Amino acid sequence: MRPSERTANQIRPVTFTRNYTLHAEGSVLVEFGNTKVLCTATVESGVPRFMKGQGKGWINAEYGMLPRATHTRNAREAARGKQGGRTMEIQRLIARALRAAVDLKALGENTITIDCDVIQADGGTRTASISGACVALVDALTHMRAKGMINSNPLKYMIAAISVGIYKGQAISDLEYIEDSAAETDMNVILTETGKIIEIQGTAEGEPFSFDELDELLTLAKHSIREIIDVQKQALA
């Protein structure tokens, strides 16, 4: 039995609240149960130096956690003078995933920066960030079309992400912190709305896992991501 009494394939309640802030071209508060992340999308003309002259756009991402997003206070990384390795890994993951969903040529020489700020953490912050960032990105692209910055929609497909894992010998989806911290296997999966894989991150925290267990985890992820993308589309309708 899971601590939340959810079934193995049952995800937490998921919501996407659009236009959550005033100034950003796209802003979404995404909630996966008690995990809450504010995702904003900022549009700027021009691209990084290494992209200039290619006729393509770029998507960056930054990720951070508020000091009291967790059970105990964590000092702001700015106060420590540098970002941690986990932060850099997650923000690169978010950016990679979003770039895979966009035709960068159709974006023109424009840059979209996605900021994902974790307000409250209860497991799955990176996957919630990716799922929320995709909705914020859609709103930013709509803004760009309305302003005449682009002629067509660069979005190739919606994307979403979910955590899956093996907890007390059982494959489960959408791990809360109490499950994630004790899981024998922890995996993050990012898929397109067509069911294609963008990225899989999986680690055996305790015992190695089998190919059969891997298949079971990926099946759980595919089912869960289909549910999340349905909620994304409802929020955007």
From Swiss-Prot:
GO molecular function, one term: tRNA nucleotidyltransferase activity
Family matches, as Pfam families: RNase_PH (PF01138), RNase_PH_C (PF03725)
The enzyme's E.C. designation: 2.7.7.56
Alphabetized CDD domains for the sequence: RNase_PH_bact
Enzymatic reactions: tRNA(n+1) + phosphate = tRNA(n) + a ribonucleoside 5'-diphosphate
Signal sequence extent: none
Residue sites binding phosphate per the record: R86, G124, T125, R126
InterPro entries with a match to the protein in the record: ExoRNase_PH_dom1, ExoRNase_PH_dom2, ExoRNase_PH_dom2_sf, PNPase/RNase_PH_dom_sf, Ribosomal_Su5_D2-typ_SF, RNase_PH, RNase_PH_bac-type, RNase_PH_CS
Keyword set, alphabetical order: Nucleotidyltransferase, RNA-binding, rRNA processing, Transferase, tRNA processing, tRNA-binding
GO biological process, one term: rRNA processing
Family under the similarity heading: Belongs to the RNase PH family.
Function: Phosphorolytic 3'-5' exoribonuclease that plays an important role in tRNA 3'-end maturation. Removes nucleotide residues following the 3'-CCA terminus of tRNAs; can also add nucleotides to the ends of RNA molecules by using nucleoside diphosphates as substrates, but this may not be physiologically important. Probably plays a role in initiation of 16S rRNA degradation (leading to ribosome degradation) during starvation.
Record's subunit section: Homohexameric ring arranged as a trimer of dimers.
Protein's recorded name: Ribonuclease PH
Species whose genome carries this gene: Pseudoalteromonas translucida (strain TAC 125)
